[in-house]
């Protein structure tokens, strides 16, 4: 009888680490993260690039990846260069000419963390920069007038400010849809960096007039 008990106890002790290990694996929490956004999220041409979606020019060391690596998240990064708020809901044409699925399709009810950078392409960021390039420190600009400010002012109204105001509800709509699809997720919105000095100019490194910089 004692031998039987001893054998049972020994078997139980030997099995315990296996059972505990299996339980730990089964209950170990994983944090599911989704990266959404445009080129400022995707990191175009920063190597190494993501081969799964070459048309998005998405880096494997963009900020969604860096955050996920630091925090230990399981990441699904669908950020895509050139994306607008519309591309959150509908297919986007990548730089390779192929269709890119709507970014919001990556969200699940189990998603825990979402990062988002969007809106710059809605206001036409690239075109604005191109139009504002000045041929000399005092102008004219590529758009024609001496300053970019003059080009984007019509009837006394700042057209760029109007574009920004019109983009806000579009971003709000994206955030609302994220909440609907992933109600438990924590969403972080990363803005855009300041690329101009507070005052003055640094022509020709930044080929803009002092008026447009200030």
Residue ranges: model-predicted function:
Residues 83-101:
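Charged, often glycine-rich, active-site loop that binds/positions anionic groups
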Residues 12-19, 61-65, 190-192:
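Hydrophobic alpha-helical membrane segments, chiefly transmembrane helices and signal peptide h-regions
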């Amino acid at each position: 009888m004692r031998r039987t008990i001893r054998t049972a106890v020994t078997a139980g002790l030997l099995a315990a680490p296996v059972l505990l290990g299996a339980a730990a694996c089964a209950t170990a929490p994983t944090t599911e993260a989704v990266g959404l956004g445009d080129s400022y999220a995707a990191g175009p041409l920063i190597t190494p690039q993501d081969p799964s979606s070459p048309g998005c020019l998405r880096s494997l060391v963009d900020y969604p990846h860096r955050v996920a690596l630091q925090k230990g998240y399981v990441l699904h990064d669908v950020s895509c260069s050139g994306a607008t708020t519309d591309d959150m809901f509908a297919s986007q044409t990548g730089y390779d000419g192929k269709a890119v699925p709507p970014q919001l399709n990556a969200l699940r009810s189990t998603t825990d963390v979402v990062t988002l950078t969007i809106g710059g392409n809605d206001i036409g960021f690239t075109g604005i920069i191109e139009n504002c390039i000045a041929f000399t420190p005092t102008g004219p600009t590529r758009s024609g007038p001496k300053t970019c400010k003059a080009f984007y002012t019509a009837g006394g109204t700042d057209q760029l400010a109007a574009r920004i105001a019109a983009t806000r509800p579009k971003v709000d709509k994206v955030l609302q849809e994220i909440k609907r699809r992933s109600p438990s997720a924590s969403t972080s919105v990363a803005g855009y960096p300041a690329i101009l000095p507070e005052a003055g100019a640094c022509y020709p490194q930044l080929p803009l007039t002092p008026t447009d910089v200030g």
